[in-house]
Amino acid sequence: MVHFTAEEKAAITSLWGKMNVEEAGGEALGRLLVVYPWTQRFFDNFGNLSSPSAILGNPKVKAHGKKVLTSFEDAIKNMDNLKTTFAKLSELHCDKLHVDPENFRLLGNVMVIILATHFGKEFTPEVQAAWQKLVSAVAIALGHKYH
């Protein structure tokens, strides 16, 4: 289990409160699909993923990105119990969708980049460390069913 200090929790929640989940979620998933094109195989029903502009403009990518980032709200509310919080999603992604758990880590890293670009100077090294810790812990929780 990962322990978050009060300072880390504050750093995470302060930025989360300013986050445009719809915009950032679509951007994060879109960038994942562009930078790591093999991840596109999990989204066959999303239509045109033929180019970066097609991916970033795809309404299904944006909608699913929002859904993914919305699930991070559960992580923020349950930082001390991520394994239980993501147990059902872990099972879904492992047993039904067969998603490589490495993709969770990649998406987390993309999310940190999105945060840095959106928040600039507010995204201090301390804030980055707290968010990196959270996305890593979420990736581990999502990959738990695989072990």
Curated annotation (Swiss-Prot):
Coiled coil: none annotated. Red blood cells. SUPFAM superfamilies: Globin-like. Residues 3-147 form the Globin domain. PANTHER family: HEMOGLOBIN FAMILY MEMBER (PTHR11442), HEMOGLOBIN SUBUNIT EPSILON (PTHR11442:SF7). Belongs to the globin family. The epsilon chain is a beta-type chain of early mammalian embryonic hemoglobin. Heterotetramer of two alpha chains and two epsilon chains in early embryonic hemoglobin Gower-2; two zeta chains and two epsilon chains in early embryonic hemoglobin Gower-1. This is Hemoglobin subunit epsilon. The lineage of its organism: Eukaryota, Metazoa, Chordata, Craniata, Vertebrata.
